[in-house]
Each structure stands twice: as structure tokens, then as C-alpha cells.
């Protein structure tokens, strides 16, 4: 007889028993995502995170999460082609307090503006706000026909393009350099910077569809809870402790005994 395991006998043993299926969502909690006070609608959604367990704290898993939300959802408007990025900077109870992290135009809007028979002019600039945020702003604009123009095309000369680009950079630098982040975001919501550029460039060549198409966050200053609470309109005095940071579970061996102290 061949020496070896009899597979038929061991088939119904412990090895073949199915593991108990645990629902992964039973170990997770829902947190509300709160937008800063610049926007009309503050509660923008919920996010999921694994509960605090041992040294792994739930709020640490939430900090740094980036949420991309359409401006239509912020302002309760049907038509909006701007997307704002918000980053979680702190967790208070079951609320994730976010801050501005960037802006972008939707792809369909960008594609709808690019057409034949006109010149597309783009510019970008790196600017620092008064409260220490370094932003990179991208601007785009398109030439349009003069009044009473018969010719089909409206192409700008290279010299005019350079002048318009210079004007774009000047206005973007001026608008951001003299304001803090909150005021810059308030200007980005209606895109007053794009309208200012359009007015200023009319004397060089008539423009239309002038937008700040993208804003990137390059550097942020050291985190201050007081400033974040001001952005959320809750004042600087906030002594709330995070609900999940009450204590961390410490693993001990079964036969663990504390060391004997020589003196008390």
C-alpha cells in the first residue's frame, strides 16, 4: 500500500471549513464633508473611513483627502462648468473641515470654446497670497471679430498676442498678490479676474471666453487650526476634541506584569 495521506478521510476536516465572511463596512464610519463659508451649500457629502483601532487613528486616514465638487452643487445652480478641489485639513467630531486646494474647468466647456478662425491665447503665473499660499494660475482667452467686420477670420498678430499675455499675467498677479486665499476664492467663484482681463484687453484686440481655466496649489503655509475655523465661520476658539481620538488600544501579552518600581 502506498504511504501518504488519505484525501477522502481529511476532506471533511477543519481545513475545508469555510471562513466566516465579515462585512468590511461594519468596521467603517461615515463622516460629513464640510466646505468653507465662501460657498452657499456647506454640507457637500459624506466619506467613509475605517474606525480607530489600536494605533491606527481614523482622523489620520481622513486628513489629506481631496474632494472634487462642481460649482453647481456649491451654489445650487444648474449651469456651472467650474470644478473646485477641497482638501481635508482637520476633523472635528464627525465633520471633515476642508480648505481650497485647486480649481479646473470641465472638459466639455474647454472643448466647446476651441474653434477655427480665431486665436487662442494662454498665460500662466505663480503668485503668493498675503497669507502664504503659493498658487499657479492658468488663463485662456480667444479673439473675436471687430464690430462691422466682414472678414471671416479674426487672427491676432504675434505682437498683439504677447501684449495680451503680458496683460493677463499682470492682472492675475495683482488680483492674487494683494488678497488672502479666502478673497481669491471669492473672486474665482464668479470669475471676476477673467472679466477684468477681457475689459483691459479690448484696446489691444477684442476678446471673448476669457477664463481662469485652472488653479493649482503649489505650497501651503504651516497648518493653523484658528485660521481654518475662521474659514468655516466658527471662530478661532475651538476646544472640541475629535470623537475618535479619545484613546488608543494597547496590545499586551497574556502573562504581562508591570515592572516593580524601586521607589514610589
Swiss-Prot record:
Subcellular location(s) of the protein: Cytoplasm; Nucleus; Nucleus, Nucleolus
InterPro entries registered for this protein in UniProt: Ribosomal_eS1 (IPR001593), Ribosomal_eS1_euk (IPR027500)
Phosphotyrosine, modified sites: 256
Spans annotated as Disordered: 233-264
GO function term, MF aspect, one: structural constituent of ribosome
Modified residue annotations for ADP-ribosyltyrosine: 155
GO cellular component: cytosolic small ribosomal subunit; nucleolus; small-subunit processome
Signal peptide: none
PTM text: ADP-ribosylated at Tyr-155 by PARP1 in presence of HPF1.
Modified residues (Phosphoserine): 236-237, 263
A GO biological process held by the record: cell differentiation
Pfam families: Ribosomal_S3Ae
Feature: compositional bias, Basic and acidic residues: 242-255
Keyword vocabulary terms for this entry: Acetylation, ADP-ribosylation, Cytoplasm, Differentiation, Isopeptide bond, Nucleus, Phosphoprotein, Ribonucleoprotein, Ribosomal protein, Ubl conjugation
Residues where N6-acetyllysine is found: 34, 56, 249
Complexes and interactors: Component of the small ribosomal subunit. Mature ribosomes consist of a small (40S) and a large (60S) subunit. The 40S subunit contains about 33 different proteins and 1 molecule of RNA (18S). The 60S subunit contains about 49 different proteins and 3 molecules of RNA (28S, 5.8S and 5S). Part of the small subunit (SSU) processome, composed of more than 70 proteins and the RNA chaperone small nucleolar RNA (snoRNA) U3.
Family to which the UniProt record says this protein belongs: Belongs to the eukaryotic ribosomal protein eS1 family.
Biological role: Component of the small ribosomal subunit. The ribosome is a large ribonucleoprotein complex responsible for the synthesis of proteins in the cell. Part of the small subunit (SSU) processome, first precursor of the small eukaryotic ribosomal subunit. During the assembly of the SSU processome in the nucleolus, many ribosome biogenesis factors, an RNA chaperone and ribosomal proteins associate with the nascent pre-rRNA and work in concert to generate RNA folding, modifications, rearrangements and cleavage as well as targeted degradation of pre-ribosomal RNA by the RNA exosome.
HAMAP family reported for this sequence: Ribosomal_eS1_euk
UniProt protein name: Small ribosomal subunit protein eS1
Native organism: Callithrix jacchus (White-tufted-ear marmoset)
